[in-house]
Amino acid sequence: AYDFAKGGSIKHALGYDMKLREPLDFYAVTDHGFLLGSIPDWADPNNGKAGTEPFHNLNSPENLIQESVAERSNLFQSYVRNVNSFSNIWTRLVAYVTGDTARGSTLYDVDVHRTAWKDVIQSAQRHNDPGNFTTFVAYEYTTSSARSSNTEGSSALKCLFNGTGCNFAGSPPHENGNLHRNVIYKGNKFTVEPFTRLKSLNPEDLWSWMDELRENGVDTIAIPHNSNGSNGQMFEMENWDGLPIASQYAEFRMRNEPLVEMTQVKGTSETHPILSPNDEWADFEIMDQRVGASTYSRPFGGYVRQAYL
């Protein structure tokens, strides 16, 4: 990734070469934070973890072919399901005490996760060349508005101890609106692991974590992205608990999210023809679907121009 950002050529999974027209000045690799490092661990046929067999040798050269794309895509769909499916009383207790639902799974290895995060940090530092190519340690907080009543609050205890697993994917009525953020670290102070959706789906809990880090000398910002696929919930006028937002909420959010992404390959998030009917450019690269789904994403509350107004 860093070689590509600096102007080098890399091979696409389908076999062709890719290269930027111009090298970048700064860069952050923002891998999904939750279960970071787990897939390479599961892909190792000698990992000794029952249930990981479908992932064995996943990234071996013989499997990185066009014919295996569908199979590998299906494996991605079972990514979180693996965490949900394998647990025992000890792992569920650890999950409850730590507040990290990933630790409720016998397949989750906290040392693997932290080692992968350490690799992210070291890679960014190794490629950092101030004045020429600046890198930032970063990750993606991949939450969604698919809140699950059995993984939040007091009901989480019952979920963890009933032995049937928790619904980490969430359920209606929130319908899986994208609420992803890229979390960027400043300077050379970092955490031992990222704050992920497996600790909380609530972005306000992420901000509280960031506030606490700042008090201890670790500065971060979060950058919301793909709000166009949030089903109108990235900039809604209510907080996570459904209460009207006020100035305290605005200050809380602005302190931790002073920036927002307006456009990327999955569509623009600046405005929408429904929101800006007199703007002839409002239909530029619109993606009306929620991220990773064909379901319609409501425009109101999902676009930056309206949020600023």
Report residues per predicted region.
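Extended, charged catalytic domains and RNA/DNA-binding interfaces, predominantly
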Residues: 1-309
